[in-house]
A protein has these predicted regions:
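Amphipathic alpha-helical binding modules
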Residues: 74-105
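Amphipathic protein-protein interaction modules
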Residues: 49-86
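General structural signal for secondary-structure boundaries
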Residues: 13, 41-42, 68, 98, ...
């Protein structure tokens, strides 16, 4: 229970958001997605990118980000790409949180 609280607290920190943004950009580069995200509105930018990617490129990106396929089923159908972008950002944030938590131990 404490871990969930610590994760939610971390999401609010500006430095944590910047680290999450950097992790997302790193994974976009690894997937060879040439797209510029802006820290202020990277959720909207990511949603637009996902919508414009080919299905092959999108699958490659999701694989590199390590987003479990079961998460795809819980993305709301009303705006699929916004929901998928949120799932990606949560996954990237979790990577940053775990890296910070275990690198300090």
């Amino acid at each position: 229970m404490l871990e969930k609280f610590a994760y939610k607290e971390a999401l609010l920190a500006a430095d944590f958001r910047l680290q999450t943004f950097a992790q997302l950009q790193k994974d976009l580069e690894r997937a060879q997605c040439e797209f510029t995200l802006h820290p202020a509105n990277f959720l909207d930018d990511l949603s637009k990118l996902l919508e414009n990617l080919s299905s092959e490129k999108r699958a490659q990106l999701l694989y590199l980000i390590d987003l479990p396929e079961k998460n795809d089923a819980i993305v709301p159908t009303s705006n699929y790409y916004d929901g998928l972008a949120e799932q990606i950002i949560h996954r990237e944030a979790l990577k940053v949180f775990l890296r910070n938590k275990f690198s300090s131990q």
